[in-house]
């Protein structure tokens, strides 16, 4: 089994060769003359792959992700600075009870409003029938 580096260099090499072939096939001169190709050109018919070099020469390129490889370690997201924001903690007893009361009152008001609206809607529908 080939080592990881060998597989990576082979994958990178085939990718770069594919790009060169693509560029050669879409260049303006090859688009103008689409006739029979003579064998004096640099590109032979089909993709001939010579043995890739042991180490890829362009080390600044990121390697292609291979299944099972998790890639470079990710830096954790920076947490926003908490100097200006209020500390989040368990609510104190005072805020807990008042917020519950407010929520309870608001919910009962909402229910009363929707109940009245439902009655109006039902009576209106019965009148239309």
UniProtKB/Swiss-Prot annotation:
Residues 23-101 are annotated as: Disordered. Residues 31-40, 67-80 have a biased composition (Basic and acidic residues). This is Uncharacterized protein ORF42. The gene is ORF42.
């Amino acid at each position: 089994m080939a080592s990881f580096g060998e597989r990576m260099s082979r994958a990178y090499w085939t990718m770069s060769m594919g790009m060169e072939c693509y560029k050669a096939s879409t260049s303006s001169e090859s688009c103008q003359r689409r006739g029979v190709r003579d064998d004096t050109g640099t590109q032979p018919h089909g993709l001939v792959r010579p043995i890739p070099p042991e180490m890829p020469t362009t080390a600044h390129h990121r390697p292609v992700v291979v299944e099972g490889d998790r890639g470079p370690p990710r830096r954790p997201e920076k947490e926003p600075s908490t100097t200006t924001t209020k500390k989040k903690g368990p609510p104190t007893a005072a805020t807990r009870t008042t917020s519950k009361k407010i929520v309870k009152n608001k919910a009962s008001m909402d229910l009363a409003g929707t109940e009245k609206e439902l009655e109006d809607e039902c009576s209106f529908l019965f009148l239309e029938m």
